[in-house]
C-alpha cells in the first residue's frame, strides 16, 4: 500500500458546508474511489488556517490518478468549486506532502 498525504484550502466561510458535503460523500464517488484502490481516506480541517489535511492509502499511483478522469470525480470537483480554491480544470488546488516519518 502506498501512503499519500496532501493539503488543500477551504474558503473561510465554507467550513460547515464543506463538512456537510462530505457527510456522506456521494455513493457513486465512494464506489469509484474504492474501485480505484483507495483505502483509509481521511480529511482533517484546521479551522484557524482554513487548511484541509488529507491522507489516503492507495494500491497504485496509476489507478489513483485515473480517478480524476471519471465522470463522477469531474462532477464532484465542479460541485466543490464554490467552497474551495480550484484549478482551471476544477480540481482542488492541492500540494502533496513528503512523508518524513512513519511508525507502523
UniProtKB/Swiss-Prot annotation:
It is found in: Cytoplasm. It comes from the Bacteria. It is an enzyme of class 5 (isomerase). Pathway: Carbohydrate metabolism; L-rhamnose metabolism. It catalyses: alpha-L-rhamnose = beta-L-rhamnose. The active site is at 22 (proton donor). Homodimer. PANTHER family: L-RHAMNOSE MUTAROTASE (PTHR34389:SF2). Belongs to the rhamnose mutarotase family. This is L-rhamnose mutarotase. It comes from Escherichia coli O139:H28 (strain E24377A / ETEC).
Amino acid at each position: 500500500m502506498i501512503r499519500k498525504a496532501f493539503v488543500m484550502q477551504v474558503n473561510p466561510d465554507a467550513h460547515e458546508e464543506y463538512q456537510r458535503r462530505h457527510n456522506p460523500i456521494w455513493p457513486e464517488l465512494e464506489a469509484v474511489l474504492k474501485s480505484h484502490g483507495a483505502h483509509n481516506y481521511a480529511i482533517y480541517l484546521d479551522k484557524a488556517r482554513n487548511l484541509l489535511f488529507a491522507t489516503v492509502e492507495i494500491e497504485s499511483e496509476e489507478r489513483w490518478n485515473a480517478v480524476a478522469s471519471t465522470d463522477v470525480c469531474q462532477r464532484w470537483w465542479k460541485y466543490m468549486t464554490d467552497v474551495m480554491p480550484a484549478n482551471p480544470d476544477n480540481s482542488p488546488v492541492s500540494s502533496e506532502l513528503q512523508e518524513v516519518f512513519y511508525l507502523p
